[in-house]
Design a protein with these regions (language model features):
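Active-site PLP-lysine loop of aminotransferase-like
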Residues: 1-11
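Short, well-ordered alpha-helix to beta-strand connector turns
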Residues: 6, 99, 147-148
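A general structural signal for short secondary-structure junctions and capping/turn motifs
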Residues: 1, 68-69, 92, 140-144
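C-terminal core of ALDH-fold dehydrogenases
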Residues: 113-170
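Short aromatic/hydrophobic contact patches that present stacked aromatics
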Residues: 8, 100-101, 127-129
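Generic beta-strand/beta-sheet core signal
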Residues: 12, 80, 105, 131, ...
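Hydrophobic packing residues within well-ordered alpha-helices of enzyme cores
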Residues: 19, 23, 138-141
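NAD(P)-dependent aldehyde/semialdehyde dehydrogenase
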Residues: 14-17, 24-124
Length: 170
């Protein structure tokens, strides 16, 4: 995955279960705490990303993380539920692999604070995505974050590099 891909997903509690179902339907495999720790320890060794997992197909990731037996033929990426974000949570940084961290926020303000912590750790200047029916939240995020773009209600991986129907240049 590129830097433009969804790296971390923050979901407010009121729609968390619904979002989890949607992520699983899209091919996500939700890991338990032990599996999450195994992926983290394998992907980051001595504070650096393991090149054996960078930009690899999901089959390679599943094999190297010993998750092949847990996955079905529809698995496209791994979901690492987590709580901590920022400097003391290495998984909240760049991954460049077929997995993302998933956070559950109490409300929008908590989600905004998590996004800022993630961005301050590794990502100042990177784009942020927001899915919301409340336009004011996009403005609030844009004003609070040190970002180049706030992508609203679009697939982040396509929209951040420009897209035919969103008006952003390629």
């Amino acid at each position: 995955t590129s830097c433009s891909s969804e790296n971390s997903v923050i979901v407010v509690r009121s729609i968390y279960k619904e979002a989890l179902v949607a992520l699983e339907k899209a091919g996500g495999l939700v890991l338990d705490e032990t599996e999450t720790e195994r992926v983290i320890n394998l992907h980051w060794q001595n504070g650096k990303m393991n090149t054996a997992l960078l930009a690899q197909d999901i089959d390679v990731i599943l094999d190297k993380t010993e998750l092949t037996d847990r996955a079905d033929e529809n698995t496209r990426f791994l979901i690492l539920p987590t709580v901590e974000a920022g400097q003391n949570a290495i998984a909240s940084g760049e991954k460049m692999s077929q997995f993302l961290t998933l956070y559950q926020a109490e409300d929008f303000d908590h989600a905004l604070n998590l996004a800022i912590k993630i961005q301050e750790y590794q990502g100042a200047g990177h784009s942020l995505g927001l899915h919301s029916k409340n336009d004011e939240r996009a403005h609030q995020l844009a004003m609070a974050a040190r970002t180049c773009r706030v992508i609203v209600n679009q697939a982040h991986c396509f929209a951040t590099g420009g897209f035919f129907n969103n008006g952003l240049p390629f």
